[in-house]
Amino acid sequence: MVGIRQYGVFTWVFRTFQLAIDTIVLALASALVNQQTSGGSPGKINFSVAVGSFAILTFFLTAVGRFLPTILGNPWLIAFYDFVNWVFALTGGCCIAVAIRVHACDNQKYLDRNHYTQGSMRRCQELKALCFFLWFMFGLYVASFIVQIFIAKNDTPNYTFRGRGRGKGSGPAVAPRPVMSAV
């Protein structure tokens, strides 16, 4: 079965930890959307909901790949999922960090003027937690992507193709022609 080696114990423990962080990101972002009092939810928080949802979806696609290794278990496809999650988590972390401008949550003047905190210390703390978990998620997916690239490279057949005929290491071996004395 192609791509089975990626499902070692370490990988599953790591992916389960990623799922826990993804769930926390989704829960925090959803709570912020639910608590929004006026003007609808800001797009940056909605994007964070999408980041958490997509990461959970790709976890389950990876898990299904265990049972369908030729379709969803391709190590390059899983590396692509990790890369996309990496980019989404980076984007979400940057967006939330820019939105909250990282001030102290006990500064009432800051809380009242910031559109995202809406005067609430609780929302400020939840936004800071969301920012932290998005950056932590980013780090996890960078590590996962690097590991997955090594797994994918080891699962890919190693053929070298050269423009000049057959040489050592250029492909499958060819039997030599029989000589007259061998007939």
From Swiss-Prot:
Principal subcellular localisation of the protein: cytoplasm
Topological domain spans for side Extracellular: 30-44, 97-131
Annotated region (Disordered), positions in chain: 163-183
Location(s) in or outside the cell: Cytoplasm; Golgi apparatus membrane; Cell membrane
Keywords: Cell membrane, Cytoplasm, Golgi apparatus, Membrane, Protein transport, Transmembrane, Transmembrane helix, Transport
Listed GO biological process terms: eisosome assembly; plasma membrane organization; protein localization to plasma membrane; protein transport
Membrane-spanning ranges: 9-29, 45-65, 76-96, 132-152
PANTHER family in UniProt: NON-CLASSICAL EXPORT PROTEIN 2-RELATED (PTHR28165:SF1)
Protein name listed in UniProt: Non-classical export protein 2 homolog
